[in-house]
From Swiss-Prot:
Its job: Involved in the import of serine and threonine into the cell, with the concomitant import of sodium (symport system).
Name of the gene encoding the protein in the UniProt record: sstT
Organism of provenance: Neisseria meningitidis serogroup C (strain 053442)
PANTHER family attached to this UniProt entry: PROTON/GLUTAMATE-ASPARTATE SYMPORTER, SERINE_THREONINE TRANSPORTER SSTT
Cited NCBIfam families: PRK13628.1
Record-given protein name: Serine/threonine transporter SstT
GO MF terms, alphabetically ordered: neutral L-amino acid:sodium symporter activity
Record lineage: Bacteria, Pseudomonadati, Pseudomonadota, Betaproteobacteria, Neisseriales
């Protein structure tokens, strides 16, 4: 018993990032050497992601409602500058992907469209309609189905009602609930090394590395665009806001948010991680409690890259020449589509036919491109989520630090 306690204390003294790195390395080894054991270890990953997904909707609802209920008149949440950054970042990602698609034209071997079972949206109107319907969804269903647009809407309304009509005791109870849920999130995050070990070992055991070799160039363009956004464009946007070296903040967000998101492959599951990081960075709670859940829904630079690169690849494969005006229009469509990706089953991949329609590509061919997306999804989806989620907290921090700098001046 004493040995067990001393072992846990020894593990506790090692930083969480190092524990995650150890879990990652061990997962690669187990998944490669013993696929059967790797698949069995996947249970740890499923439990970890399941716990994060379960607690995230409750956390967002309670935290946003508590923040609005406790909000003092005269204090501002400063959400507008962050939304502007989200839109600039998403459009920059789409434009970068268009340029990369022109400079590095990619031809792909189309997979069978039968691999895709869900129906894509018929147009941009359907995407926007889906978002608006999510806004007025039943609040219980919104929490149960992790509909963050609906959760945010009802939390804002309930919080405003409590602020104007609730007693001090009621508002304090809601605040205590928010603190309790945040504590539960901290407990779950402590299991991240074990969860990531399970996720990595099962992924390696299921897919190996050979399945991705046939799409190496397509993956190189996708990942190259995402790396360029994460390491060049986003730092430039952050520098524009804070007027100092952005890379310490960028690398902190990539390390403490992006790594989690890469392995969980879920922006929703990463919301508690981003909330904890925002608190650690000393950001304004009234701001990040709203902007981070909102970012998980509308800040989709990674999705814009996926939609654009695969649409451009489809055009090149069909022998279609893409002029600059059409490419610019594709960037705009990809930006709007990406912002609605969370409201579409299948996310960014099932918005590819919408982008392909700009080039007159048939739906049958477009769905074959979607099938290719699912084949490379083990890497594409992980990198996309890591970029999307780490950018949520990065832009929130940039806007908040800019506000603090302006106030100091």
């Amino acid at each position: 018993m004493a040995f067990g306690k001393s072992l846990f204390h020894a593990i506790g003294r090692v930083s969480l990032v190092r524990q995650i790195a150890a879990g990652l390395a061990l997962g690669i080894v187990i998944g490669s050497v013993s696929p059967q054991l790797g698949l069995a270890a996947g249970l740890f990953g499923s439990l970890f992601v399941g716990a994060l997904k379960a607690v995230a909707p409750v956390l967002v609802f309670i935290l946003v409602a508590a923040t609005i209920a406790q909000h003092q008149k005269g204090n501002k949440a400063h959400i507008r500058p962050i939304i502007v950054l989200y839109l600039i970042g998403t459009f920059s990602a789409a434009l970068t992907a268009v340029i990369a698609g022109m400079v590095f034209p990619t031809h792909i071997v189309l997979a069978g469209a039968g691999d895709v079972s869900a129906a894509p949206p018929s147009g941009i109107v359907e995407v926007l309609k889906s978002l608006l319907m999510n806004l007025v969804a039943n609040p219980i269903n919104a929490i149960a189905n992790a509909n963050y647009i609906g959760i945010l809407a009802w939390a804002l309304v309930l919080g405003a009602a409590l602020r104007n009509h609730g007693s001090d005791v009621t508002r304090q109870v809601v605040a205590d609930l928010a603190e309790a849920v945040s504590t539960v999130v901290k407990w779950i995050i402590r299991f991240a090394p074990l969860g990531i070990f399970g996720l990595v070992s099962s992924t390696i055991a299921e897919t190996g590395f050979g399945a991705l070799a046939g799409y190496a160039k397509l993956l190189a363009v996708l990942l190259g665009c995402m790396a360029f956004i994460a390491l060049v464009v986003n730092p430039a946007i952050v520098w524009w806001k804070i007027r100092r070296n952005p890379y310490p903040l960028v690398f902190t967000c990539l390390r403490e948010s992006g790594v989690y998101a890469f392995f969980t492959r879920s922006s929703a599951a990463n919301i508690p991680v981003n909330m904890a990081l925002a608190k650690k960075l000393g950001l304004h709670e009234d701001t990040y409690s709203i902007s981070i859940p909102l970012g998980a829904t509308v800040n989709m630079g990674g999705a814009a890259i996926t939609i654009t690169v695969l649409a451009m690849a489809a055009a090149h494969t069909q022998g279609i020449q893409v002029d600059f005006a059409t490419a610019l229009l594709l960037s705009l469509v990809a930006t709007v589509s990406a912002c609605g990706a969370s409201g579409v089953a299948g996310g960014s991949l099932l918005l590819i036919p919408l982008a392909c329609s700009l080039f007159g590509i048939s739906n049958d061919v477009a769905m074959q491109v979607v099938a290719v997306g699912f084949i490379i999804g083990v890497i594409q989806d992980s990198a996309e989520t890591a970029l999307n989620s780490s950018t949520d907290v990065l832009f929130t921090a940039a806007a908040d630090l800019c506000r603090q700098r302006n106030r100091a001046e």
